Amino acid sequence: MANTKEIQDRIKSINDTLKITNAMYMISSSKLKKSKKMLSDTEPYFFTLQSEMSRILRHIPDISSIYFKTNEDKDAADKKVGYIVITADKGLAGSYNHNVLKLAQEQLEKNPNHSLFVLGELGRHYFEQRGIEIEKQFHYTVQNPTLNRARNISEEIIELYRKGELDEVYIIYTSMINAIQEETQIEQLLPLKKADFNIQIPVDFKREELALKPSPEVVMDRIVPDYIVGFVYGALVESFSCEQNARMMAMEAASKSAKDMLHDLDIQYNRARQASITQEITEVIAGAKSQKKKRKK
C-alpha cells in the first residue's frame, strides 16, 4: 500500500488537473454561447440572399451563370476537385477532429485529382505528416470566426473556380444536431445546384413582375459570392461551436473521472493513515511491554 505522502501528492496533482478541466469547460461554454449569437445575428441576411436567388431562379430557371454550370462535358477523372476541410487549432475535443479527418481522407482517396484547403492547425499537421499535399498559402485560424475571414476564404476559392483551376468545390465541416450530438458533413459549395433553391412554382402562384438590371445574369453573379460567404461563415461558426461543445463534454468527463479518482484516493489515504496510526500504537505498546519486562529483571 502506498504511504500517506505519496497519496497526498497524487491527490494534489489530481486537484490541480481538476482546476484546469473546470476552467477549460467554462471557457468553452462561454465561447459556445458567443458563437451561437454571432450566427443568429447574421443568419437573416444570408437567408434573404438565398430567398432572392430562389426567386430569380423561379422566374428565370434557365439563367446562364458560371456558378451553376454542371461540367457534364468532363469525365469525373478529369475534374479538379477542391476540398475545404475545417478542423481545430487545438486538441482535447473528443472525437471532433478524428471524424472530420476520417471523412476528408475517404474523399481524397475517391478523387486523386484534388486540391486540399485545410483550416485548423491540427488538420494541417495531420496531412503534412502523411505526405499529403495541401495549399500552403491557405493559412487561416478557426478560432473566433469572423465574416471578414469567411469573405477572404470565399474570394480565394471563387477566384480559382472562375479561372477553371477548380471544377468542383466541397466543404467538410461539423454541424450541431443538438447539445449532445454532432455530425460531420460534406456539402458541395460550387457549382451550385438549382434544385437546392426550391424553384418549383406553386399551382396558385401569381407570377409578379421582376426587373433585374443591368441583367439577370449580372445580378445573380453579384449575389452568389455573398451567398458563398454566408455558407462558409455558417460552416466556420457551426464547426467552432461543435469544437467547443465537444471540448465541454470531454472536460466534463475528465472532471468526473478526476472526482472519482479523488474519492478512491481519499479512501486509500484514510486506510493508510489508519494503518499508520495502528502501527504506531502497536509499536508504543510493544515498547512499553519491553520496558516493563526490563524493570522486572
Say what each PLM segment does.
Residues 1-297:
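C-terminal beta-strand-loop-alpha-helix "lid" module of Rossmann-like NAD(P)-dependent dehydrogenases
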